[in-house]
C-alpha cells in the first residue's frame, strides 16, 4: 500500500516520502530504496551508492541494472569516500557501553577490553601506526559482534542507543579489518589531556580507489563533474578511475574581465609569519572596501587567524561592518550569516576556508563582489598527515607525496572559495590571493586557466621575512 501511494506521486520529495512511510508505519529509508525499482532518476547523496553499506549499489548488482552515474561536485568524493571506509573505536565510549551492556555481553566485551589494554601498554608514543589491525583484538571484536547480533535478534526492542552505535561501529571495523590493505592505515591515538589515558583505534582509509573502482565499473557510464578536478592524475589515482577515462576541460562561461584576480607577492601567511601579516591584511581589506563598498568574504585557515585579523580591522577601521563565522554554527545561524549578503548590504564576512561558506553557496550580483583568501588552504602538518604523505609516496611516487597530501587538497578549497564571487555572466568582482606562494609557477598552473592573475605588492612598514 505504501509503495502504491508513493508511485502515485510523479515527483517524490523527501518530505512526501517520509509522510507516506510514517502513515504506513514503515522505515522511510527502506521505502525509498524499494521505490528505486520504478524510478527513472534517483537524486541522492554519495553514500547511497558508494558507501560499503549503500543499498543502491547492492540493488544494482541484484537486479543487474544498467545505470548511469552523474557525480556532482566530484572533488568532494575523495574525502567523503575516505570517511565511508574509515572506522574508529573510542575507548571512553567503549567503557560506557560496557557499563550498560546486557549480561550476555559482559564476557565478550571484557575480552575486547583486555586486548585493548595490552595495546595501550605496548604503545610508547601518543600516535603510532601499525602494519595491520592486531589479530587478537579483531577476533575478540568479531566474537562480540556475533554475540550482540544474536542478542538483538532475540531482543530487538529496548536496547540503549549507545549499544546500537557500538554494534554498527564494531561491524564496520571488522569488515574493514578483513579488507585491510595498503589503501588504509591502522593507527592508535592516545589522549591524556583529561588526566587519564584514552585511546582511539582507527582503520583510516587514505586511498578509496579499491573500494570505489568496482562501483564505477558496475555503471554503464559515469560522468564526474566539478570546477576543481585538477590535476587529473590526483583524482584518477585516489578515486580509482579507469585508465581510459577521458578528461574534458569545458571552457568557462566567465571571462577574465569579469574577475580581477591579484596575488600578493610580498606577504607570507605561514604560521611563523602570521602575527606580522595581521596589519597588512586588515589594511588591504579596508583599502579595497573604501575603493568599492559592497559585500566581501574574507577566508582564513583557522578561527584563531580569522579572529586576529578581524580584531586588527575593527581596531583600525571600526566603521566597516563585519560579521564572522563561528564554531559549530547551526542551520539558523548559517542562514543568518548568509542573509547579511543582501544586494543592498555592505560589509565583510569572515569565514574559515574549507568550511560551510567556502563552497556550495550562491551569492550572485551585488550580494558578493569580492573575496580575500589569506591562505593556501594546506592541511595541517601533523603525524596523521605525515603518515599519509609517506604512504602516497610509496604508492604513487616520491614526487606526489606532498601534492596529494597537502597542495592539491588546499588549492581545491582556494579555487572553490574564489568561485563564490562570479556566479553569472553579468557578475563583476575581485579576488585577492594573499600569500607569496601564489606567485610560484607550480601553484599558478593549478589555478583556473580563465583567470588572469596579476602580481601585486602591499605597502609594508618593513620587509617581511620570506
Where are these regions (language model features)?
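ASCE RecA-like P-loop NTPase motor cores
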Residues: 1-466
Amino acid at each position: 500500500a505504501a509503495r502504491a501511494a508513493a508511485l502515485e506521486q510523479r515527483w517524490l520529495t523527501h518530505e512526501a516520502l517520509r509522510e507516506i512511510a510514517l502513515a504506513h508505519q514503515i522505515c522511510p529509508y527502506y521505502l525509498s530504496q524499494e521505490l528505486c525499482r520504478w524510478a527513472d532518476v534517483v537524486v541522492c547523496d554519495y553514500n547511497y551508492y558508494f558507501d560499503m553499506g549503500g543499498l543502491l549499489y547492492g540493488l544494482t548488482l541484484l537486479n543487474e541494472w544498467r545505470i548511469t552515474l552523474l557525480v556532482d561536485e566530484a572533488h568532494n568524493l575523495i574525502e567523503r569516500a575516505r570517511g565511508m571506509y574509515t572506522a574508529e573505536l573510542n575507548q571512553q565510549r567503549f567503557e560506557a557501553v560496557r557499563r550498560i551492556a546486557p549480561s550476555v555481553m559482559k564476557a565478550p566485551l571484557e575480552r575486547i577490553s583486555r586486548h585493548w589494554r595490552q595495546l595501550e601498554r605496548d604503545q610508547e608514543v601518543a600516535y603510532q601506526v601499525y602494519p595491520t589491525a592486531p589479530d587478537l583484538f579483531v577476533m575478540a571484536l568479531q566474537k562480540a559482534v556475533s554475540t550482540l547480533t544474536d542478542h538483538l535478534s532475540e531482543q530487538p526492542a529496548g536496547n540503549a542507543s549507545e549499544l546500537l552505535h557500538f554494534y554498527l561501529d564494531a561491524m564496520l571495523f571488522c569488515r574493514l579489518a578483513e579488507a585491510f590493505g595498503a589503501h588504509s592505515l591502522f593507527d592508535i591515538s592516545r589522549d591524556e589531556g583529561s588526566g587519564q589515558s584514552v585511546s582511539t583505534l582507527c582503520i583510516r582509509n587514505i586511498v578509496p580507489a579499491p573500494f570505489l573502482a568496482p562501483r564505477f565499473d558496475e555503471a554503464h557510464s559515469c560522468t564526474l563533474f566539478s570546477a576543481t578536478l585538477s590535476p587529473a592524475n590526483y583524482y584518477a589515482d585516489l578515486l580509482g578511475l579507469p585508465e581510459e577515462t577521458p578528461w574534458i576541460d569545458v571552457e568557462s562561461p566567465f571571462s577574465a574581465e569579469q574577475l580581477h584576480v591579484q596575488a600578493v607577492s610580498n606577504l607570507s601567511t605561514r604560521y611563523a609569519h602570521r602575527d606580522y601579516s595581521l596589519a597588512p591584511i586588515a589594511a588591504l581589506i579596508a583599502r579595497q572596501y573604501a575603493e568599492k563598498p559592497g559585500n566581501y568574504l574574507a577566508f582564513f585557515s583557522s578561527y584563531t587567524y580569522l579572529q586576529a585579523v578581524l580584531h586588527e580591522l575593527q581596531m583600525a577601521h571600526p566603521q566597516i561592518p563585519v560579521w564572522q563565522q563561528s564554531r559549530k554554527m547551526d542551520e539558523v545561524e548559517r542562514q543568518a550569516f548568509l542573509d547579511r549578503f543582501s544586494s543592498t548590504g555592505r560589509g565583510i564576512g569572515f569565514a574559515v576556508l574549507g568550511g560551510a561558506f567556502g563552497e556550495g553557496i550562491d551569492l550572485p550580483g551585488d550580494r558578493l563582489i569580492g573575496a580575500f583568501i589569506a591562505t593556501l588552504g594546506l592541511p595541517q602538518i601533523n603525524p596523521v598527515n605525515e603518515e599519509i604523505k609517506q604512504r602516497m609516496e610509496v604508492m604513487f611516487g616520491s614526487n606526489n607525496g606532498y601534492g596529494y597530501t597537502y597542495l592539491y587538497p588546499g588549492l581545491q578549497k582556494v579555487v572553490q572559495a574564489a568561485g563564490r564571487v562570479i556566479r553569472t555572466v553579468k557578475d563583476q568582482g575581485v579576488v585577492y590571493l594573499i600569500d607569496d606562494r601564489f606567485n610560484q609557477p607550480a601553484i599558478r598552473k593549478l589555478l583556473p586557466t580563465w583567470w588572469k592573475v596579476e602580481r601585486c605588492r602591499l605597502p609594508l612598514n618593513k620587509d617581511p621575512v620570506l
